[in-house]
């Protein structure tokens, strides 16, 4: 964990109070595609709060957490920043995040009651709220309409099952010409975790003490997903994905179908090829319909020297007004109840409603205090499965032992 954060967190990333008496606070994010939406929110806030300027800073995901951790240990943290489910526990326990429960309990413009309970719980600990839900995301089955039309196959819909998808992938598969029926990389949130839930399994037990790889339902689901490449050959291999991402395959017309989160919608819209040739459908059903869902949050540095301004801004970020601006600007599906249509309408060229509708069958992205550690255990153990040299049954015990060791050490 981030031991030493409490002692180190003494600065902040803002410019503080300028000579004019204005206060500038920093708002740190990691997604450039969402930057226009976040800046629109900042401008609306500034218009309602003269004297407070908000500086939106974008740091790519790969460097974001390195920079934030360094800031937490004493250099400087941004005043307000995005938080992720994989990281919240260590930052909350490190004492570097401000408790926002009182701000929201006393707010006259918003309330935690407007957000999905699972997301509020995700960013809370010991009766304190360390992040205000910003958005939510689910996973969809994107498909290439042009390839489907050429093959005379009906587009995917809510009736599709694993078998329907496999049959379509086999028909569409044309590896000799560099086109694959489906894109199935070794990926948890957009990939095999969805299939575990669809098969009636789970990734972690409710009490976060056991790995779902104890169960046949998980083993069967992950094997079926891996077999898309290693048995059926309808997906590129993992070595191919090491050279080209699933998005790169899809956006160049070399993948007829792929699993992509709602956060990729802007990327699909901004790409000329996918804007003209692609659309999205619900995930196929196994024993049941299911998708993983997650959501980001907005947090405030406990070390901020601009506490009043930062709290005002994070309160505004949770209002219906700010959430609608987020959706209208195509940034993400807003977490505030009743505002998700703003995102759907921003991308009317795609059937984005499927992302919203799938919340009826959504399972919160598996998490614990040390999510990234047990995710690495899963990933490393499954590599030979996705290379075709081992089966999931061969590595299940290794996953169970490794994941449950991480979980046991969290207590």
Regions found by a protein language model. Give the residues of each.
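Hinge/lid segment of periplasmic solute-binding proteins
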Residues: 85-140, 163-166, 277-281, 342-358
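Glycine-centered hinge/linker elements that transmit conformational signals in sensory
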Residues: 169-171, 208-239, 283
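Long, aromatic- and glycine/proline-rich binding clefts that accommodate carbohydrate-like moieties
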Residues: 278, 328-380, 384, 409-410
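Short, low-complexity disordered leader/linker segments with a strong preference
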Residues: 1-26, 47, 341, 347, ...
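Extracytoplasmic/periplasmic substrate-recognition and gating elements
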Residues: 43, 47-48, 53, 151, ...
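Short, well-ordered beta-strand elements
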Residues: 20-32, 52-57, 79-80, 130, ...
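Short, solvent-exposed loop/beta-turn-alpha elements that line the ligand-binding surface or hinge
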Residues: 101-115, 158, 176, 201-220, ...
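Extracytoplasmic "Venus flytrap"/periplasmic binding protein-like
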Residues: 44-115, 150-152, 249, 253-257, ...
């Amino acid at each position: 964990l981030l031991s030493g954060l409490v002692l180190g967190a003494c600065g902040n990333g803002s410019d503080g109070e300028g000579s004019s008496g204005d206060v500038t606070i920093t708002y740190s994010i990691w997604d450039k595609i969402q930057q226009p939406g976040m800046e629109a929110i900042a401008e609306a806030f500034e218009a309602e709060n003269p004297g407070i300027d908000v500086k939106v800073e974008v740091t790519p995901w790969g460097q974001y957490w390195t920079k934030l951790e360094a800031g937490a240990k004493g250099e400087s943290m941004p005043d307000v920043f995005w938080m992720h489910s994989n990281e919240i526990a260590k930052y909350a326990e490190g004492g570097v995040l401000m408790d926002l429960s009182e701000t929201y309990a006393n707010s006259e413009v918003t309330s935690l009651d407007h957000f999905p309970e699972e997301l509020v719980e995700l960013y809370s600990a010991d009766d304190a709220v360390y992040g205000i839900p910003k958005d939510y995301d689910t996973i969809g089955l994107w498909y290439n309409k042009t390839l489907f039309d050429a093959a005379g196959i009906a587009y995917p819909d809510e009736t599709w099952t694993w078998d329907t998808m496999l049959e379509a992938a086999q028909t569409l598969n044309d590896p000799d010409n560099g086109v694959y029926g489906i894109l199935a990389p070794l990926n948890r949130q957009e990939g095999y975790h969805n299939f575990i839930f669809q098969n009636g399994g789970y990734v972690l037990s409710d009490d976060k003490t056991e790995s779902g790889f104890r169960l046949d339902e998980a083993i069967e689901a992950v094997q079926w997903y891996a077999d898309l490449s290693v048995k059926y050959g309808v997906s590129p291999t993992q070595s191919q994905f090491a050279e080209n991402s699933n998005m790169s395959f899809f956006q160049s017309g070399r993948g007829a179908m792929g699993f992509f989160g709602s956060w990729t919608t802007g990327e699909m819209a901004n790409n000329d090829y996918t804007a003209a040739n692609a659309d999205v459908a619900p995930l196929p059903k196994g024993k049941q319909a299911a998708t993983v869902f997650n959501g980001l949050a907005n947090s405030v540095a406990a070390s901020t020297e601009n506490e009043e301004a930062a709290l005002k801004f994070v309160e505004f970020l949770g209002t219906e007004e700010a959430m609608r601006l987020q959706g209208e600007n195509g940034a993400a599906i807003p977490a505030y109840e009743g505002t998700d249509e703003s995102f759907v309408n921003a991308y009317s060229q795609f059937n984005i409603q499927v992302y919203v509708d799938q919340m009826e069958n959504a399972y919160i992205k598996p998490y614990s205090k040390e999510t990234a550690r047990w995710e690495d255990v899963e990933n490393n153990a499954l590599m030979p499965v996705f290379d075709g040299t081992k089966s999931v049954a061969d590595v299940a015990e290794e996953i169970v032992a490794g994941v449950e060791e991480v979980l046991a050490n969290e207590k």
